[in-house]
Each structure stands twice: as structure tokens, then as C-alpha cells.
Design a protein with these regions (language model features):
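Short, hydrophobic/amphipathic alpha-helical patches that form generic packing surfaces
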Residues: 59, 158-169, 220-223, 301-317
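Short N-terminal or domain-adjacent regulatory/targeting segments
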Residues: 10-39, 171-195, 236-241, 246
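Phosphate-moiety recognition in structured ligand-binding domains
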Residues: 2-17, 136, 254, 258-261, ...
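Conserved active-site and cofactor/substrate-binding residues in soluble primary-metabolism enzymes
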Residues: 9, 55, 154, 158, ...
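Glycine-rich phosphate-binding loops that contact phosphosugars or nucleotide phosphates
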Residues: 38-183, 252-288
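Internal, active-site/partner-interface "lid" segment
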Residues: 147, 163-198, 325-355
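Anionic-ligand anchoring segments at beta-strand to alpha-helix junctions in alpha/beta enzyme folds, i.e.
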Residues: 31-88, 196-247
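Cofactor-/ligand-binding subdomain signature composed of acidic, glycine-rich
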Residues: 1-40, 149, 153-162, 168, ...
Length: 355
């Protein structure tokens, strides 16, 4: 087994501080941020993160609050017409505001819709492009005493906590969360349960409050060098997307199972997941089920913590990996592609999309 690199803290050690992080959120004032988020719900909210991050949670929370929320990567934001940007509110989320993704997105949003664009950040200095490009009264800068390594762990939980508090208006919520993280690993109906180290592919299914978690787990799995992963909502999986999973379970044509289904469930998905197990998953499909009894947007945070616990358990205990400092056998510098692939230059050559 490959030994985890110890140049950075183990991912599981950072996750263990989740309660402390969320108690910090409870003491943080989010009043101004809440007022901006919930002002003029008739306008869609476009949520943009740094490259590599999906901003599904604020989009979901905005939808629950009565508006229409849309998540967009910086490249997807480039495909939105100026008219669409003008008619929307734009929320840019960036811890430091220092990479070219948020620099591009903040410049474009501020040029088209300066009053309707806001920034969420943890860094208050001259290197943060949000302070250079946006109106100061629309920048919401929060303290973040929690650093991370290669992947976002504590700052991800901090961000989700601040978003939940701002949208829900609830100042106390950690008492509703379970910090004894858990998941269940079992065989669907019959057969031998494989060791997790034999699994090369994961199929993650979600609904409602689980969607933001699905994107975060995909990112953690792939960026952590752990396994390939397909994410899909429960209904779309029934439209033929079960074929790959079934073709990778042991049979007279397949020597060894190397796939596992991950089911994210709340009370809303429990019956759907049970039915799907019977109708769309092989009898000998190994399953990881991550469930919460919470039936509110707080369920996203519980599912996130339990899901990260599974991912880090898989990596550290079964594969000998530290997702917070992944092995990189290709030799490609982990940070180089962010700056060397010049997407902004290419976009400017062709201008706005057209019919």
C-alpha cells in the first residue's frame, strides 16, 4: 500500500474540526449579507465560484427562499448574454480572489451589472480582485481562521455554514447536527462484499438537498486522486445510466466487481432509493448509503460532513492516500494548468455567443 504523504495534515483531521468551524459561524454576523441575498427575489441569482468549485448550495438556498438560483462556472458565465447578466443578481464566491477565473468573472459582471454584483470572500487585501473590481458595499468579507491544504475542507464547511445562516436566518443550528460521522457499506441483495480498495468507479446518486454534496464529493474524489465518479440524480439514473454500473459488477462475463453505488438520502429520497435498489442496481452491487433524518437545507451540511468522512476513510484507510496532499504521478504541477491554460484570451477573440 502507498503511504499517505505527511507534508500536510490528514484530510480526516481537518474534518474532525467541523463542529468548531460551525460554532464559529454561529458567532458570525451575516445580517448585511442576508439582506443582499434576499433583496429583490424576483431577479435570478447567478452563483459563480472559482474554477473547480460548483456553487450549487447558494443556488439551491435561493430557490428555497422563493427566487430562481443558477450555478455557473466562470466558463459557463462567459456563455451568458449581457442582457441575462443585467437582469440578474450575480454572486461571486472566492476565498482569496487571486486566480484568473474569479478575476475574469468579476470584471465581466462589474462591467455589465455593477450594482447587482456582490462578492463573498475571506480575504481583505489589495491582491483580492473582488476589492478591485466590485463596489465595496457589495463585498461581504468574513473571517476565516481555518486554512486548508490542496482541497477545501474546513473552508468549505465554513462557507456552507455562512450561506445556511444567511439564507435561513437561524443563529443556532449545530445542536441539530451529528458530528459522529457515519456511513453504511453493504451489498444490495446477495453476494460477497468487496474490499473498498478494489473499487475503481463510484456512481453517486442524489436528490434535493444532496445535489450540492454530489458536486463536492466528485471534486474531492477526482482532485484527491482517489477514484473516478459519476454523479446523477435518482430519476436521470433510471434513463439508461445504470448500464455502466451493471456492467462492472462480477458476473460470468465480468471477473471482479470494481464499481460501487453511493446513495445520498434524506427522508425525501428514502423510498426512491429503496425502489431504485430493487429495480436499477445489480443484486451484487456494493452500496454506500449516507443518510440524514434532517428534512431541511441543513441536511446538505450533514450529508457533506458524512460524505467527506467516507471519502477520507476510503482514501486514508483503504488506499493509503491523503486527499489533502495527493500523489501526482503525471508530474504535472498541480497549480500550473490554472494559469497556463489561457481561457480568457480565447474567449475575448470570439466575443459573445450568438445565433
Amino acid at each position: 500500500m502507498i503511504k499517505p504523504k505527511q507534508d500536510k495534515p490528514l484530510a480526516s483531521a481537518l474534518l474532525a474540526q467541523a463542529k468548531e468551524v460551525l460554532e464559529f459561524v454561529e458567532r458570525t454576523d451575516v445580517t448585511d449579507f442576508r439582506n443582499w441575498l434576499l433583496g429583490d427575489l424576483s431577479k435570478p441569482l447567478v452563483c459563480i465560484g472559482n474554477g473547480g468549485k460548483h456553487t450549487t448550495y447558494p443556488a439551491l438556498l435561493y430557490g428555497i427562499s422563493g427566487g430562481v438560483g443558477k450555478t455557473a462556472t466562470p466558463l459557463e458565465f462567459a456563455s451568458m448574454s449581457p442582457e441575462a447578466v443585467k437582469r440578474s443578481k450575480v454572486l461571486l464566491l472566492s476565498s482569496s480572489g487571486k486566480n484568473m477565473d474569479v478575476t475574469y468573472a468579476s470584471k465581466r459582471a462589474a462591467e455589465i451589472n455593477p450594482e447587482g454584483t456582490a462578492g463573498f470572500t475571506f480575504t481583505d487585501n489589495e491582491r483580492n480582485c473582488l476589492f478591485k473590481n466590485l463596489n465595496r458595499h457589495n463585498i461581504f468579507c468574513f473571517k476565516n481562521p481555518y486554512s486548508d491544504g490542496f482541497i477545501s475542507i474546513r473552508s468549505k464547511i465554513l462557507t456552507c455554514g455562512l450561506l445556511y445562516k444567511a439564507f435561513s436566518g437561524k443563529n443556532s443550528f449545530t445542536d441539530k447536527l451529528n458530528f459522529d460521522f457515519k456511513y453504511d457499506y453493504f451489498i444490495n441483495k446477495s453476494g460477497e462484499l468487496p474490499d473498498l480498495k478494489r473499487i475503481k468507479h463510484f456512481v453517486l446518486l442524489y436528490g434535493s438537498y444532496g445535489e450540492p454534496v454530489a458536486h463536492d464529493i466528485e471534486s474531492a474524489m477526482v482532485e484527491g486522486g482517489i477514484a473516478s465518479i459519476q454523479i446523477c440524480d435518482y430519476r436521470n439514473f433510471c434513463h439508461g445510466r445504470f448500464i455502466f454500473a451493471g456492467n462492472h459488477c462480477q458476473s460470468n462475463k465480468v471477473p471482479e466487481t470494481d464499481v460501487c453505488a453511493i446513495l445520498l438520502t434524506t427522508p425525501r429520497e428514502a423510498k426512491i432509493a429503496e425502489s431504485l435498489r430493487k429495480e436499477a442496481l445489480a443484486d451484487n452491487m456494493p452500496i454506500v448509503q449516507i443518510h440524514t433524518d434532517l428534512d431541511s437545507s441543513l441536511a446538505t451540511i450533514q450529508l457533506l460532513m458524512d460524505s467527506l468522512h467516507f471519502v477520507f476513510d476510503l482514501a486514508e484507510k483503504h488506499l493509503g492516500l491523503n486527499p489533502n496532499s495527493p500523489h501526482n504521478f503525471s508530474g504535472i504541477d498541480k497549480r500550473k494548468p490554472m494559469n497556463s491554460v489561457r481561457f480568457v484570451t480565447a474567449l475575448k477573440e470570439h466575443g459573445e455567443l450568438s445565433h
